[in-house]
């Protein structure tokens, strides 16, 4: 059976359409104006030419104009200086602004957990890029300024210490002089000398005290000015503190420049390597050393960008579109880092041949992947969902033997080691010479028993000495293959927990929610870039209040208790017929407490109802409605499994059949994004879910009944 014959109702039906969306499409799609405004304001902030982008809004321009201009010497082309770019400096400033914004949250955490906080996110390393490059020393202008301030502070401290020593010496002199006077040195000459010495010492003390007072006053004035500046920034409501757009757009611009820089590096490095003389000397190695230093500097810039992306994910709750942008940037950045590492390894094999590995300078990277996701046994990926890219250095002194092979691994071991059943089909694919890519429309033939697994890809490379070496890729994102839909809840929980915590015992609330939102959109089969109804800020507040005690730090044990309830609601949203669509249309209000329901139904007509998830019965719906009895009161009905147990009876059918339910309070949102109710008759709200019946064809002269 071909892939086209499968109904991709698990995740492929929605996810495949977005699998080939590039980072450029995400940032510069059909609607270019909003992006151009954002990029333009970022460029203005960095005082670089905008290249014809649209003008940003007035409030952002005013903020950027208030910033001090950069020195002309700080601006240069990537790969042609030992300093970081002004945009990287600005990236560090944006990170510092985010940290300042998160300080009140950290203070609240200290009040909650005490000084012995169970987690210190500032010490958590960012996602590592397996790079052989040494850690570069940052050369940002801002850090140099901070270093100068540190030196000035040290000098001030030394100066104060000197003053203290001088005062002590003078006091000792005064004491000695007084002792001399008491010991009977009564000659007029001696007395005059002593008096003069005392006067001089007193004058010195006065001068020193005046200097100390002036320094203290200057320090106090500087502190007051800094406090006033911070208060002004808080009053102005700087948009950079609450929006990820400046960081995301800046990194996107950097990625575009880095792509051009890498192409130039490959060309330059190829020329240098091809022109090397047989006997190497200092003059022939100097250009390679210079290029190697540029690569180290560029790797430092990439590390800064990766740290900024990780900090954004951990410190700020992102909208779905921004989440998609962040992961696309991270994917492209990892590929660029791998390419840079290959170029650097190639130079190091000449500069330091004794320390270089004798393997081909080739790498396999995942250009696109649909994971993390739960996949049903027998499903097949789309043609462009899983693509492997071959990267090389500046010289292609090797031959590729055979196709690229995919292997499923669990805990770093192949899953089919002791299993005779082959878990994958279409697991061997050729490399397209024009693009150096291999496309894997994998078909999954066996379940993974609720265990998360990964994919690795390998290819045989033969060098010029006819030595064959296997080159392997890094592991893919995790996924789980299930054999029955009843396994989905447990498998999705395993996958979400692994993806969110990544081996850590505790994570920030923002990091947890960003991961949950991503998995929720996949589970409800929504467009991950522009979903119709993701989890709103009010849904997230409900979750944080009811399951995590409004804490800003989430522990794995907290997650286990949360998933017992939330996982069942996700299972219902995913597999029960029409439920995902009912959620997206707002017919199911979703996550709402009983008291909130009672407040919403106050003063409503009899028959008005709201649909929500039951708080005490996970995965089931509760319907709150106004009864027809007098006096009217709010009733609550728990939808039973047998209410929709018939083969063709759906939840909309159940609502249509019961006269107690007349007018639906449908979830919608106002212009500010706040939820509100829209009152509709149930026939209007559920009309699209009614079964389509065709009129019978008249037979033998009989006429059909008219309704």
Swiss-Prot record:
Stretches with biased composition (Low complexity): 90-111, 142-238
Residues annotated as domain SH2: 583-686
Ranges where the record places region Disordered: 70-246
Keyword Zinc-finger: no
Annotated compartments: Cytoplasm; Nucleus
InterPro entries, A to Z: EF-hand_12, p53-like_TF_DNA-bd_sf, RHD_DNA_bind_dom_sf, SH2, SH2_dom_sf, STAT, STAT_TF_coiled-coil, STAT_TF_homologue_coiled-coil
GO biological process: cell surface receptor signaling pathway via JAK-STAT; cell surface receptor signaling pathway via STAT; culmination involved in sorocarp development; defense response; negative regulation of DNA-templated transcription; positive regulation of gene expression; regulation of cell population proliferation; regulation of gene expression
Phosphotyrosine PTM sites in chain numbering: 702
Annotated site location: Interaction with DNA: 380, 577
Domain of life of the source: Eukaryota
Disruption phenotype: Cells are hypersensitive to the chlorinated hexaphenone DIF. They form slugs, but there is little or no stalk cell differentiation. After several days of developmental arrest very small spore masses appear that are supported by columns of apparently undifferentiated cells.
Processing and modification events after translation: Tyrosine phosphorylated in response to cAMP. Not tyrosine phosphorylated in growing cells. Tyrosine phosphorylation is first detected at the tight mound stage, continues throughout the slug stage and early culmination, and starts to decrease at mid-culmination. Barely detectable in fruiting bodies.
Polar residues biased stretches: 70-89, 112-121
GO cellular component: cytoplasm; cytosol; nucleus
Annotated family: Belongs to the transcription factor STAT family.
Subunit-structure text: Monomer, in the absence of tyrosine phosphorylation. Homodimer, or heterodimer with another family member, when tyrosine phosphorylated.
The protein's name: Signal transducer and activator of transcription A
Originating species: Dictyostelium discoideum (Social amoeba)
